[in-house]
Amino acid sequence: MTALKNDRFLRALLKQPVDVTPVWMMRQAGRYLPEYRATRAKAGDFMSLCMNPELACEVTLQPLDRYPQLDAAILFSDILTIPDAMGQGLYFETGEGPRFRKVVSSLADIEALPVPDPEQDLGYVMDAVRTIRRELNGRVPLIGFSGSPWTLATYMVEGGSSKDFRKSKAMLYDNPKAMHALLDKLAQSVTSYLNGQIRAGAQAVQIFDSWGGSLSAAAYQEFSLVYMRKIVDGLIREHDGRRVPVILFTKGGGLWLESMAEVGAEALGLDWTCDIGSARARVGERVALQGNMDPSVLYANPAAIRAEVARILAAYGKGTGHVFNLGHGITPEVDPAHAGAFFEAVHELSAQYHG
């Protein structure tokens, strides 16, 4: 494989020295970019875009072509590819987000679910990873990703997005045996899926536990964290002669960082409700930290964006082990110039904290 020209993202995750704080952005290939909207229109719809390796590659690279400051690319895909490959029948309803034609509601439903083979059942994702790695040609590392078992389970049990997770939590408390069976099958599926991405060329992976923060502290430990630990334990950790770092991101998980730091991931993602300085004091000896600017800051003027970047950099302090990111994904209404101001500010203002 081609040598990396810019490896500061991987170095920061491994707590090795860097010249400036690396930066990337969740949903950096997305609807705020006019070029993304044009490619999506060409594809026809969101899933057609995900399932076309050439177009998925095109949108993955668009933010890198626009913003030379970006230190990583992230695979363009969706967390719900796994349940779709399990036969749940994913589709997107305008204005309502993702929906499933089949809903999981019993142990019998769960026992009937297959564990997808990454190359046979999710080959379009593996092909996209290979295509992106080839086209990147060592420019920056490529991040692969998956949803966490708990997060995927909520969609499968609810039949789509949910505000209160009523059905998922009812199963969790009323029929924990069924929920554990589903989570165990999903942990196997995610492990296999991420290992497929790593073999295809992903140089780091992130587990998105988007709905872990909806759980009580006890339920988080039993129904989310334990399954993410199983995944981390089963991942390929060395590939192409390099360590493959793992980032664990539980939105709303700021109270549980100490437990998360024990799972074996190299880094924890933080949402914007955490103070990154306090997080570093709590777990910074054990893990790198990624985050954690409020995505809404990008609606503000460039001077305000710069001030918030400066505040977060100062809160983290000197030294490596910080990957700058938003605390969640960029929203579609953001002016692309404001994203550019954000990336520029991170590199310009962080140099003083290194070296």
UniProtKB/Swiss-Prot annotation:
Protein family: Belongs to the uroporphyrinogen decarboxylase family.
Keyword Lyase: yes
Reactions performed catalytically: uroporphyrinogen III + 4 H(+) = coproporphyrinogen III + 4 CO2
Gene from which this protein is expressed: hemE
EC number per UniProt: 4.1.1.37
UniProt subcellular location: Cytoplasm
One function term, GO molecular function aspect: uroporphyrinogen decarboxylase activity
Residues holding substrate: R27, Q28, A29, G30, R31, D78, Y155, S210, H328
Enzyme kind, highest EC tier: lyase
UniProt function note: Catalyzes the decarboxylation of four acetate groups of uroporphyrinogen-III to yield coproporphyrinogen-III.
Subunit-level organization: Homodimer.
UniProtKB keywords: Cytoplasm, Decarboxylase, Lyase, Porphyrin biosynthesis
Annotated signal peptide: none
UniProt record, GO biological process: protoporphyrinogen IX biosynthetic process from glutamate
GO cellular component: cytosol
Site, as annotated: Transition state stabilizer: D78
Pfam families (UniProt xref): URO-D
InterPro entries: UROD/MetE-like_sf, Uroporphyrinogen_deCO2ase_HemE, Uroporphyrinogen_deCOase
Predominant localisation class: cytoplasm
Listed pathway(s): Porphyrin-containing compound metabolism; protoporphyrin-IX biosynthesis; coproporphyrinogen-III from 5-aminolevulinate: step 4/4
Stated name of the protein: Uroporphyrinogen decarboxylase
